[in-house]
Amino acid sequence: MTTTKSLVRLAHSSDEAEVLAHIRIMHAESGWRELDIDRCRIFLARAFDRKGGILGVIGAPGHIRAMIYVLITNAWYTSDHHLEELFCWVHPDHRNSDYSKLLIEFAKDCSDRISVEMGSKCPLIMGILTGKRMAAKVRLYRRFFGIPVGAYFAHNVCWPQAEPSEEDFWRLPSMAKWLRRHSTGNERKMAS
């Protein structure tokens, strides 16, 4: 059996051109501000130089199929670190794969490893900021993380290829059943 660790590798500076090509595709699908390639290069360098960025990719050099970027950062009110996902993306030709699941597992593994190294928990914060296929993405993240801990709302944003969603993400029947089976009374109160 192939493991997550063997499929997801850390990107290297030699992957930059290919990663940038994928970023252009990703931005065309879901970017909501103008793409600044020089700014992208700054964040890629943080990952390539191991200075607070982690860029995991699936695929050999020249054949990258999926990628995830997590940033070691902190909230404005603390010096305690956490991992923040900047993107988790699978090339359109490979969307019927399990790559998104493998990337999420990779990010969780990074959080676990950094927690051990730091001697305290390094939380992983992942979310969905998109106008396309939101319902499916929310369901995927719920399977890995459980109950959401927040939500984003936007004003004056034009999403490319936006798809309306009528689904109420907070009241999914399957999640209600899961909650009844697996959560404590306090967790159920917080979710309602």
Model-derived segments and spans:
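Conserved N-terminal entry element of GNAT/NAT acetyltransferase domains
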Residues: 1-14, 159-192
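A short helix-loop-beta-strand connector motif used in the catalytic cores of GNAT acetyltransferases and
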Residues: 45-56
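Conserved beta-strand in the GNAT
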Residues: 57, 63-73
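Conserved acyl-CoA
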Residues: 102-122
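Conserved beta-strand-loop-alpha-helix junction that forms the acyl-donor binding cleft
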Residues: 107, 120-137, 156-157
